[in-house]
Amino acid sequence: MRARALQHFLRSGGVIAYPTESCFGLGCDPTNHRALKRLLRIKGRPQRKGLIVIAQHFSQLQKLIAPVTPEQKQRMFTRWPGPHTWLVPASRRCPALLRGRHTSLAVRVTANPLAANLCRHAGMALVSTSANHNGRVPAKTARECHRLFGGRVKVLPGRTGGASKPSTIQDLITGAIVRP
């Protein structure tokens, strides 16, 4: 999918399935309310749980998160780019559907070249939640995504990064590991 077509598709509320570090992810424009509702419905994920947002560069995340100190940013980049997700206080502009019932947003600068290129071509950060029905095993291939979601999502080809487990999730403020 070409960059302009991808941008148009996402800005129009489209949902994609794409390869990430460990599995295929479902993604959409993180600022499009209709797309967020659609993704949550397709996945069967409760709104209260919140979603992860990935980016190619930190700058793609800045409008969604509250300002961070230079020390906090440095801490984040000890793990980025890579499969490490930080819980960062959300900005007032961050959609409630992204945060769920939380005051923080889960964010990651991806090391997966395909996912990073998607963010670059889309011109934005992307939602990244595992491509599965809530509570089920995530899809590892485009074929599995087609089988699970049919025509409800645009499946983009590619291979996952080969990581065997989902990204670690850590709270930036407290340092607590939420998911090892």
UniProtKB/Swiss-Prot annotation:
CC per GO annotation: cytoplasm
UniProt keyword Nucleotidyltransferase present: yes
One Pfam family, short name: Sua5_yciO_yrdC
Keyword tRNA processing carried by entry: yes
YrdC-like domain residues: 1-180
GO BP terms: regulation of translational fidelity; tRNA threonylcarbamoyladenosine modification
Summary of the function given for this chain in its UniProt record: Required for the formation of a threonylcarbamoyl group on adenosine at position 37 (t(6)A37) in tRNAs that read codons beginning with adenine. Catalyzes the conversion of L-threonine, HCO(3)(-)/CO(2) and ATP to give threonylcarbamoyl-AMP (TC-AMP) as the acyladenylate intermediate, with the release of diphosphate.
Protein name according to UniProt: Threonylcarbamoyl-AMP synthase
Species this protein is from: Methylobacillus flagellatus (strain ATCC 51484 / DSM 6875 / VKM B-1610 / KT)
